[in-house]
A protein has these predicted regions:
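Extracellular/lumenal glycan-associated context and N-glycosylation machinery
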Residues: 1-52
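Short, structured coil/loop segments at alpha-helix boundaries
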Residues: 21, 25, 89-92, 156-158, ...
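An amphipathic, basic-hydrophobic helix/alpha-beta surface used to engage anionic
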Residues: 35-286, 326-329
C-alpha cells in the first residue's frame, strides 16, 4: 500500500508528465519521471522480515499466566521499520508487556519480545495470526504480512477437591472389576497372614507351612466395581449471569471435582453434556488418570447453547448404563419439563443424585435485588426438587455467586448426604 508521501509523489509526477507533454518541456518531463522512479525503485527494494511465536505451555488452569515469546529477524541488507501485532482472544487479559510492538531493526538484526497473559475463563483458545507491517527505505510503501502461525492453548477449569461423596461400591462378577489394593474377594494375590480358626483350608499356603511349620493363609486383592455417569446441563439457560459466574461454570467445576474424586477411588466414570447438537458430548465410562483427562478435555470446551432437556441426554446414556450405575445430574433445573418424568423412569434401577447450582442467587447478586420473578422461579425449583426426592433421588442445592464453588460448604453438604437418611433435600 502507498503512504501519503507516495501518493503525493505519484500525483506530482503524473501532473508534471502531463504538463510536460502539453508544454513540450523536457525539464518538466525529466522531473516528473524522477518522482515516479522513486516509487518504482522503492517497490522493487522489498524488505525480508521473519517473525514467529512461541507459547510457553499449551495447558494451564484458570487464572494461571502464560508467557508468549515473539522472535523477529531482519534478513534484508538495510534497516527496517517494523510494526508487530499479535492477535489475542478477547477472553484473555494482558498482564505484562504488550502484544503490539514498534521496532527498528538493523540489517541482519534480530530481537526477542515477550509478553504475559492471564486466562480467567476455561476454554480452547487460539493465538494469532501474527501481523507484520513493514515500510520501505523511502517511506513510500508499506506492506502488511500475515504470518499464518496459529498457537493453541487449553485452559482447564480450576475445581475444588472433595473430601467424600455418598456413592458406595458393590461386589460384581463383571469382567471390568477394579482392584482396590485391599484384602477381600478376588483372584490376584495380595499378601499372607497367620491362620485364624475358621479360615478355609484351600487358602492355606502349604509351601510356607513346609518351610516354617506355621500355618499361613493367602489373602487376595479385593475387587469392586462402581460405574458412575455424570450428566452436565449446558442449555442456553445455564449461561445466565456473568461469563465467570453462572450455572454452567459452577456445574463444570463440580463435575470435574466429582469425576476426580470417584476416579481416585478406582471407579469407572462417564460424562455427558447436553443442550444442543453442538455441545452434546459423550465420554464412555472408564477408569484411571487418562479418563480424567478425557473428561476435563470435554468440560474445557463445552458452551451454553440449545434447549434439549435431560430426557435426551438420558436416552443417549442408556447404552452405557449397567443396572447399578449411579447417575449424577448437575443442572439448575430451570425450564426443563423432562426431568421429573425421566427421573421416574430410572427410580427403581439406578441411584440418582441431583446437584443444582442456585441460578437465582447468581441473578439476584447481579441485579442487586430479589424480585417476585426470582421468588416464583425459586419456589418452582424447590417443588421440582421435592418431586425428585419423592422418587428416591438425593438432591442438593449448590450456592452460586462465586467463580470457584465454596469447597467447605460443598463438602459439608456431601457429608450430610452421606448420613443414613438420604431421602431429603439439602437447601
Amino acid at each position: 500500500m502507498l503512504t501519503l508521501k507516495a501518493v503525493a509523489f505519484l500525483s506530482a509526477g503524473a501532473l508534471l508528465v502531463v504538463v510536460a507533454f502539453m508544454a513540450l518541456d523536457l525539464q518538466l518531463m525529466v522531473l516528473g519521471l524522477m518522482l515516479l522512479s522513486f516509487l518504482a525503485v522503492s517497490k522493487v527494494m522489498k524488505l525480508n522480515i521473519e517473525a514467529d511465536r512461541k507459547v510457553e505451555t499449551e495447558r494451564v488452569l484458570e487464572g494461571e499466566r502464560i508467557k508468549v515469546v515473539l522472535k523477529v529477524r531482519n534478513r534484508s541488507s538495510r534497516e527496517a521499520f517494523v510494526i508487530l501485532y499479535d492477535e489475542l482472544p478477547p477472553e484473555v487479559r494482558l498482564v505484562r508487556g504488550s502484544n503490539r510492538q514498534v521496532l527498528v531493526l538493523e540489517a541482519g538484526g534480530k530481537t526477542r519480545l515477550e509478553y504475559t497473559i492471564e486466562a480467567p475463563l476455561r476454554g480452547h483458545y487460539t493465538f494469532g495470526p501474527l501481523k507484520v507491517r513493514r515500510r520501505d527505505f523511502f517511506n513510500l510503501h508499506f506492506e502488511e504480512e500475515i504470518v499464518e502461525e496459529i498457537s493453541y492453548v487449553s485452559v482447564y477449569p480450576r475445581f475444588p477437591e472433595l473430601e467424600k461423596f455418598p456413592v458406595k461400591s458393590y461386589q460384581s462378577s463383571y469382567f471390568e472389576m477394579m482392584p482396590l489394593h485391599l484384602t477381600g474377594l478376588g483372584y490376584e494375590f495380595f499378601c499372607i497372614r497367620d491362620y485364624i480358626k475358621g479360615d478355609p483350608l484351600k487358602r492355606i499356603n502349604w509351601k510356607v507351612y513346609a518351610r516354617t511349620r506355621e500355618l499361613m493363609v493367602n489373602e487376595y486383592e479385593k475387587e469392586n466395581l462402581n460405574d458412575a455417569f455424570i450428566l452436565v446441563d449446558a442449555r442456553e439457560v445455564t449461561k445466565a449471569g456473568t461469563p465467570l459466574v453462572n450455572s454452567l461454570e459452577v456445574g463444570v467445576k463440580l463435575a470435574a471435582s466429582v469425576a476426580s474424586f470417584l476416579l481416585k477411588g478406582r471407579n469407572q466414570v462417564g460424562l455427558i453434556t447436553y443442550g444442543g447438537p453442538n455441545n452434546s458430548y459423550v465420554v464412555p465410562p472408564g477408569p484411571g488418570k487418562n479418563q480424567l483427562d478425557n473428561i476435563l478435555s470435554v468440560l474445557v470446551g463445552v458452551r451454553a447453547q440449545g434447549e434439549e432437556g435431560f430426557k435426551v441426554a438420558l436416552d443417549k446414556a442408556r447404552s452405557y448404563l449397567t443396572p447399578r450405575t449411579t447417575l449424577i445430574l448437575i443442572s439448575p433445573l430451570d425450564f426443563d419439563e423432562t426431568v421429573v418424568n425421566a427421573a421416574k423412569e430410572i427410580a427403581n434401577s439406578h441411584r440418582f443424585f441431583v446437584f443444582s447450582p442456585n441460578s437465582h442467587e447468581i441473578e439476584r447478586e447481579i441485579a442487586g435485588a430479589f424480585t417476585s420473578k426470582h421468588t416464583m422461579l425459586e419456589l418452582e425449583k424447590r417443588l421440582v426438587l421435592e418431586e425428585l426426592q419423592s422418587f428416591g433421588a438425593v438432591t442438593a442445592t449448590i450456592p452460586g455467586g462465586e467463580a470457584l464453588p465454596n469447597v467447605a460448604l460443598i463438602n459439608a453438604k456431601l457429608a450430610e448426604l452421606s448420613q443414613p437418611n438420604l431421602k431429603r433435600v439439602v437447601a
